[in-house]
Amino acid sequence: MTTQLTTETRMCPVRDLNPQQSLRRRRIYPVNRTGHGLYYRHNDLNLQFRSPLNQSISFTISAMNLLLLRTDQIKQNIAIVSGRQFDQLSKVHRAEIGDSVRIGEINGLMGTGIITAMDEQSATIQVNLHSSPPTALPLTMILALPRPKMLRRIIQTIAAMGVKKLYLVNSHRVEKSFWQTAFLQPDALREQLILGLEQARDTHMPEIIQRKLFKPFVEDELGEIITGTNALVAQPSSQSSCPVNSADPISLAIGPEGGFIPYEIEKLNQIGFESVHLGPRILRVENAVPALISRLYPA
């Protein structure tokens, strides 16, 4: 039985409980009232629907995606979590001692962890890593530097969607002040990448390379970067539509708001980029990025 949500969902804080834990600890939280009944979240493992006829349907969901840890946080299979990640555990997921959480090691394996101790500032977790992360997309992205606030969202998006190499490049329509933002500092970029990886349950950290001069980058580096790939540049005025469900490695160039100027498109075409479009609608960069990735490599 399938029921369509008809109103805004109000998600309540939910624990990440182990299915073997006692029923006594499994709480039911009202989540959303629909035209067909009331949805409940039954711990983090099941979403239970109760219809007007009192019929109950349950299916598996996940409340906590992944707690991504640095290698130096894990010593002898024990990790201590504090700061933002501890706040997520304690305040959002209402975790307690004995609860199970999903764990990943940056650039390593994924698995589970059991909370063995907690205080007001940190949690101690017994870690068991045993499974591989999702396969990376065979996609290299060349992106004209977006404005700072948009940059953070895009970085999270590309990390969540499996892109592992991103070149941030200059363009005529990129404002010089964008290159001065603190969001381009390594720690700031890493923070956004971790958020994206935690969202998608991935551990492999993408590589971000910054190039502030467009012409030298295209003439001296980009030709070698795209070798062995299908090189595409997003251009709304193109006569060719973007490929769908590609089986080949792709190098994808995306311009700034307003697009690459004709000179830049010409330089890219000269080294082998094919101009493609997504249709008659003009999208913001933050919307074009996931649209293009999803079209090229649908799930």
Q: For each of these PLM feature ranges, what is it?
A:
Residues P262-A299:
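Structured adenosyl-cofactor binding patch, chiefly the S-adenosyl-L-methionine
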Residues T3, D16-N18, Y29, N46:
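Short glycine-rich, low-complexity segments
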Residues P133-N230:
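RNA substrate-binding interface of SAM-dependent RNA methyltransferases
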Residues I225-I265, F273-V276:
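Active-site/ligand-binding-proximal alpha/beta "capping" segment
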Residues M1-E8, G35-Q55:
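N-terminal, intrinsically disordered charge-dense segments
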Residues L45, F49, L53-S131:
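N-terminal positively charged helical leader segments and presequences
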